[in-house]
Amino acid sequence: MPVLSIIACKMLEDELTRVLSLDATLRHLILVDNLDGMGLSRKLRAQNRSHLLIDRDEIPDRIKDLQKDDFGKFMKPLLKGFHIIRGRASENASAQEHIVVVNVLRMALHSDGKLIKDEVYKNVRDMSRFSDGILLLYGLCGNSLGDIGNDLRDLSCPIYFLTDRDDKRVDDCIAVALGGNKRYEETLRGFPEVGFFFTPMWAFNWREIEKEANNSSKSQSLGSMLNSLGYQKVAMLDTGLHYTEDFGVESKVGEFASLYNLEIVRLQGSTEIVDRCYQQAKEGKFNRKHSGL
């Protein structure tokens, strides 16, 4: 039973909730038991998606137990009669189940390019030990993760990336929400007065973003920085996902915009990239091991 691990940015929690809750073939879902995964766990429970919360150090043993049980189910019908071995083996191979292991990393990583690189690399190496493939739910993130394919080419399992329809890795989570780099560039050109894009998760966590900005080397809060740079608007991206409590986007974005005297632009988002890349990683369609594209 192959293992697909997902290392995810907390800002893509809603997109991850969608693909995991809609995957009717997924029977074994494990979440790394940490504080940053609690939001995803709550949303999955609300969607009646069963899953296990397991301490990181215990996950390899739990995977072995699941694989052992699966092997027993596979062998039992084969031992009933030699004449059915070929048919049964083929049937079981085509219906082979996956184990999906999800590790949500802390949002504060966004404040420092070196920090995000170090943490993601560490977790990819760590989880590769028990994985047959790793789906990285991060964009390039200011190119902090641009060389990960080459840097970790010694791994024993492939890394799958979030890519747009041109097969290029997406810049960041906003490019993911807009449907790709091309649409992102078009939006930036079409709305030059927009200084920040709010997805539901960014909206829900904007006060924490402000706190991060204040604690970093920046002397200004996010809103004050937008004001000083002359931006007059912020964008609210509606991806159609309403897993975030209250979908606080309208009230949260309105709260932020009012505080800094900014207008709100409403834009249509998309879940296409995460939907497609999750399915492709699960099916192993990308045979380009460790692609750095």
Predicted regions and their residues:
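Extended, basic/helix-rich recognition subdomains
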Residues: L222-L293
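A conserved mid-domain beta-alpha-beta active-site/ligand-binding segment of alpha/beta enzyme cores
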Residues: Y184-K252
